[in-house]
């Protein structure tokens, strides 16, 4: 059995009502719901929310909303694992450690069926506990600086002063799109970003933080470019 859990709280601060704001003709949450449904991977596509309007929009997009998330798991400090664990409990899956659960973020407009399938394949073929989306970091933090109170600048890694950028190690960060694991891993003390995790590498052109208006507009431009290229 496989379940997709899309966590979508109603209290977005920087972009109010972000999770159901129109994006390319649909409420933004409808895009990851569509990707999950079209992948054919999941027995259930669940939206975990504390918000009645989000629940209604999610159902209209084809997702299930079998429970309402409590307020204590819907504030700025609620972490992903706690939200997924709550969903696992509500779905009565605590005693089924091999069930596979994919957490997909509600603004993951660039997630598609192929990326979700690649993540599942890596989870099945490896001995890892978590598989999640990653993207490259550019420019490299190995050439980064710190700033003192008097505005003096110091290299964070001065040993790299004379090195060319192309000679520095490649760096990656969380693309904040999806996270695959079994129920057993979600319920464990293992960290999502730990030594038993594997990445699905996504081109930066398909990654965009959406935490403010300029980022929202940038995501819309990227989305339009990708849609027109298909």
Each language-model region and where it sits:
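Short phosphate-binding loop-to-helix
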Residues: 53-101, 111, 118
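Conserved core of the sugar-phosphate nucleotidyltransferase
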Residues: 100, 109-196
């Amino acid at each position: 059995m496989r379940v997709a859990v899309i966590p979508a709280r109603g209290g977005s601060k920087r972009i109010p009502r972000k999770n159901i704001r129109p994006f390319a003709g649909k409420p933004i949450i409808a895009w990851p719901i569509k990707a999950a449904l079209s992948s054919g991977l999941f027995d259930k596509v669940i939206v975990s929310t504390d918000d009645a309007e989000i629940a209604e929009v999610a159902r209209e997009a084809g997702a299930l909303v079998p429970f309402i998330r409590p307020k204590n798991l819907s504030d700025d400090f609620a972490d992903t694992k706690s939200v997924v664990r709550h969903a696992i409990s509500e779905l009565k899956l605590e005693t089924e450690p091999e069930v596979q659960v994919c957490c997909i973020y509600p603004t993951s407009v660039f997630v598609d069926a192929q990326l979700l399938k690649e993540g599942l394949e890596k989870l099945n073929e490896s001995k890892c506990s978590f598989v999640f989306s990653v993207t490259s970091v550019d420019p490299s933090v190995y050439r980064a600086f710190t700033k003192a109170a008097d505005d003096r600048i110091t290299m964070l890694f001065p040993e790299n002063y004379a090195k060319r950028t192309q000679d520095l190690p490649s760096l990656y960060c969380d693309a904040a799109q999806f996270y695959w694991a079994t129920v057993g891993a979600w319920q464990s003390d293992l960290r999502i970003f730990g030594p038993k995790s594997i990445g699905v590498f996504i081109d930066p052109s398909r990654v965009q933080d959406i935490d403010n208006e300029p980022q929202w507009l940038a995501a819309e431009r990227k989305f339009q470019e990708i849609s027109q290229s298909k």
